[in-house]
UniProtKB/Swiss-Prot annotation:
Source species taxonomy: Eukaryota, Viridiplantae, Streptophyta, Embryophyta, Tracheophyta
Name recorded for this polypeptide: Cyclotide mra2
Keywords (A to Z) from UniProt: Disulfide bond, Knottin, Plant defense
Cystine residue pairs: 4-19, 8-21, 13-26
Organism: Melicytus ramiflorus (Whitey wood)
Functional summary from the UniProt entry: Probably participates in a plant defense mechanism.
Length: 29
């Protein structure tokens, strides 16, 4: 997927933007 702007190590991903956590990085589905 396409990496989002934030990581998900300390804070959750912006699921509203269609991003999910994979390998400590948020990716767009």
């Amino acid at each position: 997927g396409i990496p989002c702007a934030e990581s998900c190590v300390y804070i959750p991903c912006l699921t509203s933007a269609g991003c999910s956590c994979k390998s400590k990085v948020c990716y767009r589905n």
